[in-house]
């Protein structure tokens, strides 16, 4: 059993990670972090090269048993999150959602929407500053 977090080095990703750590601690289970940054392209990753080291350090300091997954190549973020939940007996998936404009609220991001619709376990959606 595990808690699965879809992670990006953004405020929303940090909120998801914080909520995921709390949930894993409360459920006394493993945290599986799916680092989907590479799906966004090399330019964004190059803008913050230290994020991976900071993420690894934060996970180690948390004391929560964890696994950090790094999908490679051309991949679909939602598919990788769903596969991680299935492969690690996910009890909960945690995603960070961006603030949306009134028109944008009619639509979720494609990754979030697909995970919400296809997940076999509960999905917790958090916003930056609310986790």
Model-inferred region functions:
Residues 1-51, 58-67:
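Small/aliphatic-rich secondary-structure junction motif
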Residues 95-114, 118:
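Glycine-rich, Arg-bearing micro-motifs that act as flexible, cationic patches
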Residues 35-36, 96-98, 127-128:
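Short secondary-structure boundary segments
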Residues 47-52, 83, 107-112:
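Charged helix-capping and loop-helix junction motifs
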Residues 121-131:
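Short, flexible loop segments at boundaries between secondary-structure elements
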Residues 1, 91, 120:
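Conserved acidic residues
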Residues 61-93, 131:
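Structural beta-alpha unit
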């Amino acid at each position: 059993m595990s808690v699965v977090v879809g992670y990006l080095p953004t405020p929303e990703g940090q909120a998801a990670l914080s909520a995921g750590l709390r949930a894993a601690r409360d459920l006394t289970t493993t945290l599986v972090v799916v680092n989907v940054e590479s799906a966004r392209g090399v330019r964004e990753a190059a803008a913050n090269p230290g994020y991976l080291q900071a993420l690894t350090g934060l996970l180690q300091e948390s004391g929560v048993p964890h696994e950090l997954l790094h999908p490679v190549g051309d991949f679909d973020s939602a598919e990788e999150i769903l596969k991680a939940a299935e492969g690690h007996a996910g009890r909960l998936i945690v995603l960070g959602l961006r603030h949306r404009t009134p028109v944008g609220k009619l639509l979720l991001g494609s990754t979030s929407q697909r995970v919400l619709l296809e997940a076999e376990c509960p999905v917790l959606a958090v916003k930056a500053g609310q986790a």
